[in-house]
Structures are given as C-alpha cells and as structure tokens.
Amino acid sequence: MNEIDKTPRQIVAELDKYVIGQDSAKRAIAVALRNRYRRIQLPKDMQEDISPKNLLMIGPTGVGKTEIARRLAKIVNAPFVKVEATKFTEVGYVGRDVESMARDLVEVAYRMEQNDAFKQVRAQAAQQANKRLVKLIVPAKKKQENPNQYLFNALRDLQSGSFPNMNGNDMEEVTEDVRNERLSVAEQLKRGLLENNEVTIQVDDPSTQFNNQSGMLGQMGIDLSSLSSMMPTKKVERTMTVAEAREILIKEESEKLVNSADLADAAIKRAENTGIIFIDEIDKIASKSQQNAGQVSREGVQRDILPIVEGSQISTKYGLVKTDHILFIGSGAFHESKPSDLIAELQGRFPIRVELEDLSVDDFVKILTEPNNALVKQYIAMIGTDNIDVTFTIEAIHRIAEVAYQLNHDTENIGARRLHTILEKLLEDLLFEGPDMQMGDIKITEAYVNDKIGSIVEDKDLSQYIL
C-alpha cells in the first residue's frame, strides 16, 4: 500500500476540476491529507503520538461538503464511507450501532485490496479460466468411479474438515479426438473468435448467501457472512456468452491465487492509516435545551461516537481495527443549532472548523459549465443520444444561474441541487418528445429559458412547489 504523496496545491487543483469555489475548505482538507503522508514519513515511535486533525465542515446543503470529501477519497485512492449521524442510536435502543461505521470502512478497504490483488494475478487467472472454458466447450466422458472409493474419499474430506464432493470424481477420459478438438478451441479462444458463443457454467447460488448488511442483525453488527463460508455452497447452472463466463471464471481463479488472510491484514492497515469517515448531518445530534423525555437521547449518540473519534479498537470480521489515525470529517448545516451545542469532548475532537460559503450567480455559472462532466455537458450528451444537437447560449446559462440564485434566496437554500430541478423543468419537453421527433439542432436561448420557467419563477407560491 502506497500513501499518496500529492502536495496540498496538487490536491486543491484536482478538487477544482469537480468542485467550484470553497477554497478555504479545499485548503483545509488538503492540508489534513498531506499531514497523514507526513506522519507516515516519521519514525514509528513518533507516528503513534500524532493524531489526525479532524474537520468540521459547516454550510448549507448543496454547497459541496460531501462532494469535496468524496472526490478527495478518489484522488488519493483511500477507503471512504459516508454515514448519517441521525441513523445511529445510543446503546440500548433499536438502530444502527455507531461502531458499524468502522466496520463499513474496513469492508471498503478489503474490496480495494482485493481489486488490487486481482489485477496482479489477472494474467495467471485468465490462463486457468481459458483452460476451464475449453473443457466446458469440449466436454469429455467422466470415468466411472468405484463406489467404495467414492465413500472413502467422502470420509477423508469430512475428516479433514471440508465438505465431500457430491459430484463425484472429476477425472475425465480424454480421447485423441477430444484432445485435438480442445487444441483447436483453445486457439480460437486465444484469437477471440468465440466471444459471443454461449456456454453453460456452474455458479454459486446467490439466494443461499447471507446478506450481512440487511436486517436487524446487520444493524447490530452481527456478521452472518462468516457463517456462509462454513456452509456447503449450492451451485446453479447459467448460460451466458464466453466473454461473460470468462470474467466469472477469472474471479473464481483469482480468489484461489490470492491469500485472503494477507488481504485482511492489508485492509486493516489501509483503513487505519488512510481511511476517511464522513459523518453527515452531525448538527442533527447536537443537544438542545428542550428535549422530550421519551426521545432517544442525541447526547447519548454523541457519547457513543466520541470513543471512536478519540481512538479505540473495534472488532470486524477481518480483525481488530484501531481508529486512532482514521480521518473523521463532520458535516452539517447548523441552521437550528451551533457547533458549541455539541458536547465539549466531541468539539475538541474536531479542531479544524471550515465554513463553506453560499453559492453566488458566478458560482452557478461555473458549476454549469466548468467541471469535468458539468451539468450542461451531461444534458447535452443525454439528449444527443436521440440525435438531437443541443447548445446553450452564454445568456441562457447566466439566466439559469440567476434563477437558481433567486430561488435559493427567496425559498429554501438547497445550493447547487437547485440547478438539477431547473434544468429538468427547462428541458422537460425535449427529454419527453426527443425520441419521437426529428428536431435536428436546438439552441437554448435566454428567451427559451424565460418562456419555459419565467412565469413559475415570478409566482413565488408556485415556484416553492415546482422549482
């Protein structure tokens, strides 16, 4: 595992490609990330004493709080989970256990390590997968096995702690004709001539697998997936193309080539040293002076979160994970409460406060046009699939930005999400009628914008419901 060594300036430059404005938040989060890299470079005895400087991002919805954290995790290839503080309950109440956020992080880290390991062994796994495909396409007769020998093998498997092979021995009688045909098929597979041919393979039945993330047991942190590995796997036959079957077989062969224990150790280290946990709506659990006696204590949730943020050991199915050096980012609008309403101990664990600014008209214009895959580019591409060439004039984009700013100011401030609502209403007719009409080139002008949504914007009561 290699920690990303981008400088804060490089990190901010990457974030600028996707998030408009909010320079102070980008700088703070870039410095926090760089400090983790700096800690890794220090002697071991000093590393343990340096804890991450957790951030508290304050600002209304839709200004980029979550997007900054999510994009950051992708830039540095770090395990990232987003949780909502309101989904957790204190110990003794029904609901998600706060420790599940750390378990989710380790699960993400394990998948990342697994994907990295699979990439390294893919070439070898592909060779084995192609050999299995050849045998599936050109099957050979099975050897008749002595019943006594089959019983002996079953008892031997049980004694070794594994389940007996109910399908009997896989030994084949390979004749000269079969061998020659397999050589021919192997050559055709190598040249990619059989990719669209159909083949039947056996895969694990998904209905027999435990889903650890659903139901009350998953919320309580009880891991059922470990039980599934102790149960015999039920196989079902599926018919698919050779290309699809190869990917499934490559995955199966990769699992054989990779040591799961090594992956678990690497996942724990990756989560501990580079993991990011984003706690959204943390303002909703801030204690208030008036609270009903029957209401689940918000302060209780804070006190349950506190030891995880401070640093503790949490049991996961991959082993114990220490949260001492995981970066926590709290986020909230703090409309009805203040950061000082959080318990003092939790406030102290989020020493860096960053206030995100409301979006201006210029910000909305940039959001519409500048980022990679900006909103306007997305809609142009989607409508283009119906052979309609849509263009927006500069005046139209400015008008859309002005409408978004005005509506956020006059009604509820939902930030950049307002643009989605406006564009959907603006392009409603094109999106509906486009597949059935040969419209050719369409230019979205300021007059077009005013015609489609101008009357709705002027009627404040109507705009509250539609835009």
Curated annotation (Swiss-Prot):
It holds the Pfam family AAA_2. It is found in: Cytoplasm. Coiled coil: none annotated. This is ATP-dependent protease ATPase subunit HslU. A double ring-shaped homohexamer of HslV is capped on each side by a ring-shaped HslU homohexamer. The assembly of the HslU/HslV complex is dependent on binding of ATP. Keywords: ATP-binding, Chaperone, Cytoplasm, Nucleotide-binding. HAMAP family: HslU. ATP binds at I20, G62, V63, G64, K65, T66, E67, D280, E345, R417. GO terms for biological process: protein unfolding; proteolysis involved in protein catabolic process. ATPase subunit of a proteasome-like degradation complex; this subunit has chaperone activity. The binding of ATP and its subsequent hydrolysis by HslU are essential for unfolding of protein substrates subsequently hydrolyzed by HslV. HslU recognizes the N-terminal part of its protein substrates and unfolds these before they are guided to HslV for hydrolysis. Belongs to the ClpX chaperone family. HslU subfamily. One of its GO terms (cellular component) is HslUV protease complex. Its main location: cytoplasm. One of its GO terms (molecular function) is peptidase activity.
